[in-house]
UniProtKB/Swiss-Prot annotation:
Disulfide bonds join 43-302, 54-226, 178-188, 208-247, 242-271, 363-370. One of its GO terms (cellular component) is viral envelope. Glycosylated and palmitoylated by host. Glycosylation is crucial for glycoprotein export at the cell surface. GO terms for biological process: entry receptor-mediated virion attachment to host cell; fusion of virus membrane with host endosome membrane. A lipid is attached at residue 480 (S-palmitoyl cysteine). This is Glycoprotein. The chain crosses the membrane at residues 460-480. The gene is G. It holds the Pfam family Rhabdo_glycop_FD.
Length: 524
């Protein structure tokens, strides 16, 4: 099974360096031809490890994507909305209480939300009494404001994670996208000013369950790592690889579109923006098995042809075509010139269409120009037909090409996920079933003495009170003066009573009562 796999992946991997799957390999450079004996013929070694000179194989661990198609990476979270319910009461002179209820919003703090979620983790989600109006208190001639701050948490709220830039996608975000959760920013803004979205687990990498650990063999030459043989025995070359992070995990995107995370000392550049990785589903794996079977068949055909050559001691152009190297890289090229078996060093490249190597009638393009033929013979079984057309034996079989085209059409890139509008709440679901309300202590604020009047009323009342007070003062002053006036008259009469005398009608002098008393007393 290992040789089969080693045939498949170099062919696919190195062909993808050119962006497409190959149908043929053609030398770009041909060394000088030299005659050889028939026993020097051999089937090509399609192990790319030897081509790169990396013959040192050592076991190591690496991380790769899981087998199977990944449609979307779901991240569970919740939305949190801050609601302030306020009750305002006023009690007038006679004790009549007027109550006004108000509801406002506030932007919740992420730290408070996580603490509340942890406290209420074991409880069933429901709408609690805190959504109702708070029980108001009252004081005579005062305004009392009683407020309740509630955190309304709606869970679950599912979003899609983009593995390339760790951005989140959902219809609850502005523009349906959140730039991602970082150390400094643990939440995402939503379309509501007072509602934020937060993941259940801050580390988004734990939600990205698309990796698996594997064991393989590292192919190296000194300190340089050329590639590795994966857990299934497939060789992966690091030539042309670039660095790419998936879900925040650094790794390498290989030229065949696969992604691996492994330690290497090679200097590798970052992938350009928008670079994607390929995933294969089970259908693609089945097609790969078809390609493997076809390549194994070609390997067996090469061995059969070589056995036939050594047994019969005869060589034909058709048999030489089986000795062609199937993957890009260094190898051998064979031909027959003037009944002499010839060999040359060659470096092969992949070919996508026949027009690349046969641009016109009678022209076989090698190294940018038409390769000369010797009496109608080129190399690797390629000859010039009687009508002047170039004939390639592999052009007669299209089965491998059909399999490769199927495989190419089945390559699935891991695209940026699109938020499904039905992932948050499906039709018929009741949001109340997912609501948790977390209520801190009730806040109560008592104002000073308040008469319950508007500003102009307070001024009128103050003016009237001042006028009444002034009138009351004037009244009191007036009353006090009236009380003091009789007392002053009596005092003046008492002070002059000893000097008063009365003259009777007879002309006699009648002294005052005091004089009369004193005189009478003395007379007696």
């Amino acid at each position: 099974m290992v040789p089969q796999a080693l045939l498949l992946v170099p062919l696919l991997g190195f062909s993808l360096c050119f962006g497409k799957f190959p149908i043929y390999t053609i030398p770009t450079k041909l060394g000088p031809w030299s005659p050889i004996d028939i026993h020097h013929l051999s089937c090509p070694n399609n192990l790319v490890v030897e081509d790169e000179g990396c013959t040192n194989l050592s076991g190591f661990s690496y991380m790769e994507l899981k087998v199977g198609r990944i449609s979307a990476i779901k991240v569970n979270g919740f939305t949190c909305t801050g609601v302030v319910t306020e009750a305002e009461t006023y009690t007038n002179f006679v004790g009549y209480v007027t109550t006004t209820f108000k509801r406002k919003h506030f932007r919740p703090m992420p730290g408070c939300m996580y603490s509340r979620v942890q406290l209420e983790d074991g409880r069933s989600p429901q709408i609690e009494e805190s959504l109702h109006n708070p029980y108001p208190d009252y004081h005579w001639l005062r305004t009392v404001r009683t407020t309740k701050e509630s955190l309304i948490i709606i869970s679950p709220s599912v979003t899609d994670l983009d593995p390339y830039d760790k951005s989140l996608h959902s219809r609850v975000f502005p523009g349906r996208k959140c730039s991602g959760i970082t150390v400094s920013s643990t939440y995402c803004s939503t379309n509501h000013d007072y509602t934020v979205w937060m993941p259940e687990i801050l580390r988004l990498g734990t939600s990205c369950d698309i990796f698996t650990n594997s064991r393989g063999k590292r192919a190296s030459k000194g300190s340089k790592t050329c590639g590795f043989v994966d857990e299934r025995g497939l060789y992966k070359s690091l030539k042309g690889a670039c660095k790419l992070k998936l879900c925040g995990v650094p790794g390498l995107r290989l030229m065949d579109g696969t992604w691996v995370a492994m330690q290497t000392s090679n200097e590798t550049k970052w992938c350009p923006p928008g670079q994607l990785v390929n995933l294969h589903d089970l259908h693609s794996d089945e097609i790969e098995h078809l390609v493997v079977e076809e390549l194994v068949k070609k390997r067996e055909e090469c061995l059969d042809a070589l056995e036939s050559i050594t047994t019969t001691k005869s060589v034909s152009f058709r048999r030489l075509s089986h000795l062609r190297k199937l993957v890009p890289g260094f190898g051998k090229a064979y031909t027959i010139f003037n009944k002499t078996l010839m060999e040359a060093e060659a470096h092969y490249k992949s070919v996508r269409t026949w027009n690349e190597i046969i641009p016109s009638k009678g022209c076989l393009r090698v190294g940018g120009g038409c390769h000369p033929h010797v009496n109608g013979v080129f190399f690797n079984g390629i000859i010039l037909g009687p009508d002047g057309h170039v004939l390639i034996p592999e052009m007669q079989s299209s089965l491998l090409q059909q399999h490769i085209e199927l495989l190419e059409s089945s390559v699935i890139p891991l695209m940026h996920p699109l938020a499904d509008p039905f992932t948050v709440f499906k039709d018929g679901d009741e949001i109340e079933d997912f609501v948790e309300v977390h209520l801190p202590d009730v806040h109560e604020q008592v104002s000073g003495v308040d008469l319950g009047l508007p500003n102009w009323g307070e001024y009128v009342l103050l003016s009237a009170g001042t006028l009444i007070a002034l009138m009351l003062i004037i009244f009191l002053i007036t009353c006090c003066k009236r009380v003091d006036r009789p007392e002053s008259t009596q005092r003046s009469l008492r002070g002059t009573g000893r000097n008063v005398s009365v003259t009777s009608q007879s002309g006699k002098f009648i002294p005052s009562r005091e004089s009369y008393k004193s005189g009478g007393e003395t007379g007696l």
